[in-house]
């Protein structure tokens, strides 16, 4: 036992629950006069927990746990309760006792206690915790309120967050970005739809229910127009009351009337302001193409069904527009000039 008085550097005294009970405590009870330098005898109920480090420290560097023997006494001579009061507070048991086994045989029990500053029943909970080990052979038997116990005292670890670690901050931002894929909310008379983007969340603003329905009801669109923000160029698409498509690309202003007869289609305004909502030219091409095709279909419905030449012209024009739109969608990007020339040719 004396050889353990000085622990060489690099070694730490960190016994298991089984070793504390089955070896150290059992020998202490069998030989009360035996002294173990690594575990000192301390009257726990006459000192404060913050004094344990000085009394039980082993001087081997930084320590987080302190071990000591203590003799339990009854609070009242004729009672059964253990006296766990100190000068400035008290130790309060918490939870259920844990059984300690050695080779599948019960050798002791472990009780967990928390130190409270002040007097019972009112006290301020501290971060000092103690495990009190006692010899026990019957798990369901009454606890022994007197005799030697071995204790491990330590301070509760505080959970901290590393704000410099990007992984700890990724959860909240990822959760917020995921909402852009599914979130939809109504603001006033207009609807705002949040669409996915590879680089950053971008918002499409529709100011009327007609334009929104034509964009999102793909089953009613014969060409299945799908909004996409891949390779998006910073632009803004909004509603225009007079039924015009207006695009502002740096120094160029392009305007096209999409109204046919008494029926006005939804217009779009494209602004190169990076702070506004954005969409790409490819999406604009698809949208305008679908609007032109749908307007021509409605014209043919209102015309005389006997006019076969008009029907043939319409179908021929629709096929040409579909081929043009497919070829334009196959390209990686569309410039404002190509979009303007294509829109004029298809509308005339």
Curated annotation (Swiss-Prot):
Subcellular location: Nucleus
Disulfide partners: none
Residues annotated as domain NAC: 7-156
InterPro entries in the cross-refs: NAC-dom, NAC_dom_sf
Recorded phenotype for the gene knockout or disruption: Defects in metaxylem vessel formation in seedling roots.
Function: Transcription activator that binds to the secondary wall NAC binding element (SNBE), 5'-(T/A)NN(C/T)(T/C/G)TNNNNNNNA(A/C)GN(A/C/T)(A/T)-3', and to the tracheary elements (TE) specific regulating cis-element (TERE), 5'-CTTNAAAGCNA-3', in the promoter of target genes (e.g. genes involved in secondary wall biosynthesis, cell wall modification such as xylan accumulation, and programmed cell death).
Entry protein name: NAC domain-containing protein 101
Native species: Arabidopsis thaliana (Mouse-ear cress)
